[in-house]
Design a protein with these regions (language model features):
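Short conserved beta-strand and strand-loop elements enriched in small hydrophobics
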Residues: 30-37, 121-127
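Short loop/turn segments at secondary-structure transitions that flank enzyme active sites
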Residues: 4, 38-40, 85
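Residue-level preference for beta-strand/loop junctions
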Residues: 2, 26-28
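Active-site pocket scaffolds in enzymes
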Residues: 57-65, 75, 79-128, 133-144
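A beta-strand-loop signature enriched in Asp, Gly, Thr, and Trp
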Residues: 11-25, 32-80
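Single conserved hydrophobic/aromatic residue that forms the stacking wall/gate
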Residues: 1-6, 10
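Residues that flank catalytic or metal-binding motifs in active/ligand-binding sites
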Residues: 28-30, 139
Length: 149
């Protein structure tokens, strides 16, 4: 439920504009994992763990900010948060951040190094909420990097 997944908002610096402040401000405690499996690996490994709560803007604020200039949202419009990165190196939310723009390669369990995704890599995104005695998963979002045509 909304109340069981709600959490305190991660500290925002600078503070949001007044029209984006809400006395009941909260975000959702949704754990997120990014898994990578290369063609050479038998199973995937976790390359990032972050949390939806690290978003600077919660979804209500994103909608308010989007629509304040008259740009309406309509049924069927897609609204997405973008990259969700946390405060630690292990919670960076994109490969660009994880490998720090290609300057800090990551070493995978089989010894391969990656600065960017390569053809044949499979990325799995997982999201879930946990409570006392239960875990609610959102399923897996899986994508494979294909060679350019």
């Amino acid at each position: 439920t909304k109340s069981s997944a709600a959490s305190d908002v991660y500290k925002r610096q600078p503070e949001p504009f007044d029209y984006l402040k809400n006395k009941n401000d909260h975000n959702f405690d949704i754990e997120l994992e990014v898994h990578l499996q290369t063609k050479e690996m038998n199973e995937s490994c976790v390359i990032s763990r972050t949390n939806y709560n690290y978003l600077y803007w919660n979804m209500a604020q994103q909608i308010a900010h989007h629509t304040i200039t008259g740009c309406n949202l309509r049924t069927g419009d897609l609204l997405a948060s973008g990259t969700i990165s946390g405060p630690d190196k292990d919670s960076r939310g994109s490969m660009l951040e994880i490998a720090w723009g290609g300057k800090e390669p990551i070493t995978l369990p089989n010894g391969e190094k990656r600065t960017f995704l390569e053809d044949g890599d499979v990325v799995t995104l997982k999201g879930f909420c946990k409570g006392k005695g239960y875990k609610i998963g959102f399923g897996n979002c899986i994508g494979e990097i294909k060679p350019s045509a």
